[in-house]
Amino acid sequence: MSTLHKVKAYFGMAPMDDYDDEYYEDDDRAERGAARGYARRPREDRFEEEGYIDRAGREYDDRPAPREYDEPPIYRGGYDEPRFDPRLRGPREFERPAPRLGALRGSTRGALAMDPRRMAMLFEEGSPLAKITTLRPKDYSEARTIGEKFRDGTPVIMDLVSMDNADAKRLVDFAAGLAFALRGSFDKVATKVFLLSPADVDVTADERRRIAEAGFYAYQ
């Protein structure tokens, strides 16, 4: 429709039906043109306009499935911990190798050690301990033997290791009373090992220590 014809129709100088028909024809042509333009656009442009394609240009159906991890990664100090491998593990303190048997030879010390040279010095002729004897009572009934040896002037070592605690305590009380009655001395040498010394035998603290170190009472 020309501009002049539109002006005439507006002021009633031309029929309105012609104006309406041409108006609707223009609208139909515009809609058909838009439809043809939409159909001619690439498939990706149409999908992107309607929201079916993401920003990376991939269709939703083409997205890879998320990876599945067997186990979550472990972080310590800002980096991934290496996989545990027993071969790479260093020695732990409680897994120290056992010492060789050869290293234990000659390592006995204290009351269980026996030095022949010390034994000779302790019990050389003329020494107060030259006639010492060791008794290993099994029960309290052997207290009489201990008393007789001590009464005859013989130093006695009482080894009570094999006795139960009750009988050992009774025998210790007996020996202490015996030493007090005969003016002797009663000394502990090692665990459950005691020395009864007569009044005329003076055993110094150093000699008692050497007796314990020599450990001769365990071998007599």
UniProtKB/Swiss-Prot annotation:
It is found in: Cytoplasm. Residues 33-82 are annotated as: Disordered. It comes from the Bacteria. GO terms for cellular component: cytoplasm. The keyword Plastid does not apply. One of its GO terms (biological process) is FtsZ-dependent cytokinesis. Pfam families: SepF. Residues 52-70 have a biased composition (Basic and acidic residues). Keywords: Cell cycle, Cell division, Cytoplasm, Septation. Its main location: cytoplasm. Homodimer. Interacts with FtsZ. Cell division protein that is part of the divisome complex and is recruited early to the Z-ring. Probably stimulates Z-ring formation, perhaps through the cross-linking of FtsZ protofilaments. Its function overlaps with FtsA. Belongs to the SepF family. This is Cell division protein SepF.
